[in-house]
Amino acid sequence: MHHLHPMIVCIFVMYTGIVGSDAIAGDQLLNIGVIQSKIRSLMYYTDGGASFIVVKLLPNLPPSNGTCNITSLDAYNVTLFKLLTPLIENLSKISTVTDTKTRQKRFAGVVVGLAALGVATAAQITAAVAIVKANANAAAINNLASSIQSTNKAVSDVIDASRTIATAVQAIQDHINGAIVNGITSASCRAHDALIGSILNLYLTELTTIFHNQITNPALTPLSIQALRILLGSTLPIVIESKLNTNLNTAELLSSGLLTGQIISISPMYMQMLIQINVPTFIMQPGAKVIDLIAISANHKLQEVVVQVPNRILEYANELQNYPANDCVVTPNSVCCRYNEGSPIPESQYQCLRGNLNSCTFTPIIGNFLKRFAFANGVLYANCKSLLCRCADPPHVVSQDDTQGISIIDIKRCSEMMLDTFSFRITSTFNATYVTDFSMINANIVHLSPLDLSNQINSINKSLKSAEDWIADSNFFANQARTAKTLYSLSAIALILSVITLVVVGLLIAYIIKLVSQIHQFRSLAATTMFHRENPAFFSKNNHGNIYGIS
């Protein structure tokens, strides 16, 4: 397996339904609610060589008697040219910018071309390289286009100078051959023109739908196989079966989505489109099986439980591995993967899948568990201890023994089954052996975190109760703190106001004292001045005699 890593794993459906295998004890697993839904074979595929399809967008009409003027064909030609002009210009720009001689210059030209187009993804760079290679073989492509221009076959093989096989598909030529050629000489020109116009209009509508992304986006947008199917019509299966050789049938290859196309060239002269298709090569690995498992709930001592098994397993050489296929493309008949996702499984699961039911691990289910029944291959599997299982034909209620995990109902037991509000038509007979010697009473019940809802709910309830208690305590302390803070704030404000009041009063008293002192000084000065005015002689004598000793 180590040298298969460049390949891609593809799982192709070989069997469907309940089919037993060597390593897995399918019949015994049914008793505990494990159902094998599909068994697939393992295949590898790698990229194959490129193939080319030439699509002719205009039909070849037989020459008329010279009196008919088919105007609808000219109108279709003009409309189609307008429709494809952006795509033609886009391809021409890529080819022109990237047309250099050396490999290094060519790669640089691709980058320049992508920059000019405003795109830069890895997929588009790869697509641009393909267009460059096609442009290098422009002469061969033109010869190929010219060689198919005169043919009326819907599918024809053309081999160019490099021996590249291309399939020329003229998608509407069959319609023209069947509807026009036989009656071109007998009906009126107007009728032929109208008929041709209606066919061309329908096909033009399909072309508009197919190339919408290419018209509104760069030409490097890939075509899906659905677009190719619409474009090529009924000729596509013929093309695939004759040219795209694989180990898969046409329907399987188309549904896998692995077949995609890309427009690499358009001939404006002939209105032909060259599409490149890469087809993978498939190799089957003998003896390998990939099995899908469905696990429904089962009854254990009147309690609903579910067994722990992988959703998909790989059986090879009598060994079992887990195979999730998370990165795979799933179709109704295949699962295609880029790598092998096989991984070991626990010993208990291995023994359980081998039929040792006492090694199986179950987890309890509390609440509404939806996987209580499964309908596979015309037989109904249900946990009738957790569901109301009522048969409508013949009318009766299906009872399930306490020691049984599930009930298996086939057409012998009931032809129309009612599960709660669901109605099922039973169409098949259950052929497997139902093992009755295993009792769910002795089952190994283990509480696992992924499905142990009861413990999870209890843990959540405890956490919620603890959170509520903490919130209550927090609110109490917050209220206490709020009250204490309010009292402290009021006391502080009162103290500050008191201090401010005392300061203001002190300042007022000091101001009053100073004012009174100034008033006394002013009065004393005024009295002295009055005495001086009233006794001038006294002051004159005093000054001469210096009675007060003032110099």
Curated annotation (Swiss-Prot):
Coiled-coil stretches noted in the UniProt entry, renumbered to this chain: 132-160, 456-481
Extracellular side: 24-492
Alphabetical keyword list: Cleavage on pair of basic residues, Coiled coil, Disulfide bond, Fusion of virus membrane with host cell membrane, Fusion of virus membrane with host membrane, Glycoprotein, Host cell membrane, Host membrane, Membrane, Signal, Transmembrane, Transmembrane helix, Viral envelope protein, Viral penetration into host cytoplasm, Virion, Virus entry into host cell
Positions of glycan attachment: 65, 69, 77, 90, 431, 461
Annotated GO CC locations: host cell plasma membrane; membrane; viral envelope; virion membrane
InterPro entries to which the protein is assigned, alphabetical: Fusion_F0_Paramyxovir
UniProt subcellular location: Virion membrane; Host cell membrane
Record site feature (Cleavage), residues: 106-107
Transmembrane intervals: 493-513
Protein's membrane topology: Single-pass type I membrane protein; Single-pass membrane protein
Region Fusion peptide, residue ranges: 107-131
GO biological process, one term: symbiont entry into host cell
Function of the molecule: Class I viral fusion protein. Under the current model, the protein has at least 3 conformational states: pre-fusion native state, pre-hairpin intermediate state, and post-fusion hairpin state. During viral and plasma cell membrane fusion, the heptad repeat (HR) regions assume a trimer-of-hairpins structure, positioning the fusion peptide in close proximity to the C-terminal region of the ectodomain. The formation of this structure appears to drive apposition and subsequent fusion of viral and plasma cell membranes.
Family assignment from sequence similarity: Belongs to the paramyxoviruses fusion glycoprotein family.
Protein name: Fusion glycoprotein F0
Species this chain originates from: Human parainfluenza 2 virus (strain Greer) (HPIV-2)
Lineage: Viruses, Riboviria, Orthornavirae, Negarnaviricota, Haploviricotina
